[in-house]
Amino acid sequence: MNLEELLSECTFERVTPTLLEQCEPFACGHDDLDEFFRSDYKLYADKLLGKTYAFRLINNPSKIVSIFTLSNDAIRIKQLVAEDKEQIEYVTENGEKNLRRFPGVLIGRLGTNQTLSRKGYGTAVMDFITAWFRSNEHKTGCRFIIVDAHNNPDTIRYYEKNGFQFLYSEEINEAKSMGLNIKRPNTLPLNTRLMYFDLIKIGLD
């Protein structure tokens, strides 16, 4: 499955209560994500905190292939430790070192229909998101795609496979940036890890 095949098989739409009424219940295998996409997405939309989109099969419009929620975000340089700050400044080149934050978009939630797992849809959807925000359609600058990924091997592997890397190279530094007491039991491992994709790596059409 690649991006071209995804767009030929699916429609891309904003998620609304009407759309969900027309579809089978969406399940990606993570209860918290499924619950969010059933109801909480609307609160986020009403409060202007995030917009949720879906791909539906053209030949079976009742089946949602994938859903994701997007919000504005930024990578804030002052929150990074020295080695991670140097990495961001390296990829953004010398002329931009004085910026305190770099604009990005946050994938707040993303799920693929569990009946369609391991068929390449997840990678194709990520290719769509990165291409979408790298295109000239958008009215503001967006340098990075950011995600707060569930800290489990499958999820981390998915994002790494799709070109993401950790914002904090060491998990302990990420915990400190969150104000967590790393000496307390069960602080580590973190439930989620911040990761980013640098959109400058892909060219404009």
PLM regions and their residue ranges:
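Conserved acetyl-CoA-binding loop-helix of GNAT-fold acetyltransferases
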Residues: R118-F133
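Extended hydrophobic secondary-structure segments that form protein cores and membrane-embedded regions
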Residues: T52-L57, F68, L106-I107, F144-H150
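C-terminal "cap" of GNAT-fold acetyltransferases
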Residues: A149-N152, I172-D205
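Short amphipathic alpha-helix that is part of the acyltransferase structural core
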Residues: N2-K47, A54
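A short, internal acetyl-CoA/4′-phosphopantetheine-binding micro-motif in the GNAT/acyltransferase core
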Residues: G108-R118
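Conserved beta-hairpin
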Residues: L48-T69, A82-D84
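Conserved active-site alpha-helix within GNAT-family acetyltransferase domains
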Residues: H138, A149-E170
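Conserved acyl-donor/pantetheine-binding loop and adjacent beta-alpha core of acyl/acetyltransferases
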Residues: I67-R109, A175-S177
